[in-house]
């Protein structure tokens, strides 16, 4: 679990850089802020493509080899991004980094889901808390290094990814095709399609909510009058809330059901995003949005596996499709900002959170007893 957490810390650092650096990217490449926001979508297009790569390799290669391949892919993209002299080369390198992220994210989640049921929620939550911790560190490093020196930061992250490959030798995970056959899926085919389709839609909206929030906090606050450094620090606060919330997943699950944790978190997130329309309140509310969203990702996966046990392929498809949210969410936000101005940001975020709440709530019609 330590290796998985370390990998996700680095990817959290990387993913959290884009939002605070959007203004810098716009100035560096002489483009508009909404055009710079395309970075977020390109990154997740790459992640979407990286999941099938992870899916194929984890079935045919050992877990440590898969993680090494995907980490080196990310390092290649980070190096290219640091050295790119023009916008299109920069976007191509962002895409390659996204491929690495998608592969690592899918591989790690698949490996953790394959572990024994006892303590699985804690392992998922703590490992994903590493992503949140890294995402706290990223904006802080931007403040320390200065946004205009982002290329050095990206180069250092690429080097960190290479060094992390040295710790993969301790991961013992045979190819999935060689793993012992697990119990068969006991849910009927039609019911499985309904449940899987519901959770795919819910997770697309969740990823849209999380990535768009993280990506547009800094531009909104910077245009609202805050310094770039303070806006980056508040983005770090969002990720800190996410990390703290995920660390608390174990105790929370002992007292509340996964569905209650998911729906309560989304409800609070929607209300807080609506409140962030008030410019003075936004800096204080966004860290609370992160805390509210913290348990949705891990608890939603546990909820799904409770409804359809032993469905490794379903989880793989879920992770693949959810990456679309990272493309759709920022793209919609960019269009809305172009049309209505920067103040529309929190309203779009609220809409995503409410839609996600509605789809997850519709999953209440399914129970673990739904068998066919």
Please report, for each region that a protein language model flagged, where it lies by residue.
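Extracytoplasmic gate region of multi-pass secondary transporters
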Residues: 18-19, 193-244
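Intracellular juxtamembrane helix-capping segments at the cytosolic ends
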Residues: 103-116, 295-309
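Conserved MFS/SLC helix-loop-helix module at the cytosolic interface between two early adjacent transmembrane helices
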Residues: 48-85
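Helix-breaking motifs and short loop linkers at transmembrane-helix boundaries and internal kinks
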Residues: 30, 62, 83-88, 117, ...
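C-terminal transmembrane helical hairpin of 12-TM major facilitator-type secondary transporters
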Residues: 256-300
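Helix-to-loop junctions at the C-terminal end of transmembrane segments
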Residues: 50-62, 146, 245-257, 337
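Helix-loop-helix hairpin linking two adjacent transmembrane segments in secondary transporters
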Residues: 118-119, 126-173
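Cytoplasmic helix-loop-helix junction between adjacent transmembrane helices
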Residues: 93-130
């Amino acid at each position: 679990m330590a290796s998985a957490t370390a990998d996700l810390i680095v990817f959290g650092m990387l993913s959290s850089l884009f939002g605070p650096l959007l203004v810098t990217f716009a100035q560096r490449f002489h483009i508009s802020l909404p055009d710079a926001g395309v970075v977020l979508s390109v990154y997740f297009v790459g992640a979407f493509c990286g999941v099938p790569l992870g899916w194929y390799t984890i079935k045919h290669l050992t877990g440590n080899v898969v993680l090494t391949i995907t980490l080196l892919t990310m390092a290649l993209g980070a190096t290219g991004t640091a050295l790119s002299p023009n916008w299109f080369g920069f976007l191509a390198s962002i895409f390659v980094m996204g491929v690495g992220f998608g592969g690592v994210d899918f591989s790690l989640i698949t490996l953790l889901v394959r572990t024994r049921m006892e303590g699985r929620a804690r392992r998922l939550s703590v490992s994903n808390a590493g992503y949140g911790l890294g995402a706290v560190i990223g904006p802080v490093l931007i403040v320390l290094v200065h946004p205009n020196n982002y290329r050095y930061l990206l180069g250092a992250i690429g080097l960190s990814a290479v060094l992390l490959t040295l710790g993969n030798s301790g991961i013992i995970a045979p190819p999935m095709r060689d793993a012992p056959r697990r119990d068969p899926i006991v849910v009927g085919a039609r019911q499985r399609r309904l449940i899987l389709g519901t959770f795919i839609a819910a997770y697309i909206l969740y990823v849209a909510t999380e990535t768009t929030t993280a990506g547009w906090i800094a531009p909104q606050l910077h245009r609202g009058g805050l310094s770039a450094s303070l806006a980056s620090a508040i983005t770090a606060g969002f990720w800190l809330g996410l990390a703290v919330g995920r660390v608390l997943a174990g105790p929370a699950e002992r007292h509340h059901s996964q569905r209650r944790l998911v729906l309560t978190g989304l409800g609070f997130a929607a209300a807080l995003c609506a409140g962030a329309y008030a410019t003075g309140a936004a800096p204080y509310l966004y860290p609370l949005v992160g805390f509210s969203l913290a348990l949705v990702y891990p608890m939603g996966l546990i909820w799904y596996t409770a409804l359809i046990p032993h469905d490794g392929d379903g989880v793989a498809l879920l992770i693949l499709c959810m990456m679309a949210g990272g493309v759709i969410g920022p793209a919609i936000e960019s269009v809305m900002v172009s049309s209505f101005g920067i103040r529309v940001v929190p309203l779009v975020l609220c809409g995503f959170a409410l839609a996600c709440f509605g789809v997850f709530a519709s999953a209440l019609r399914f129970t673990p007893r739904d068998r066919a």
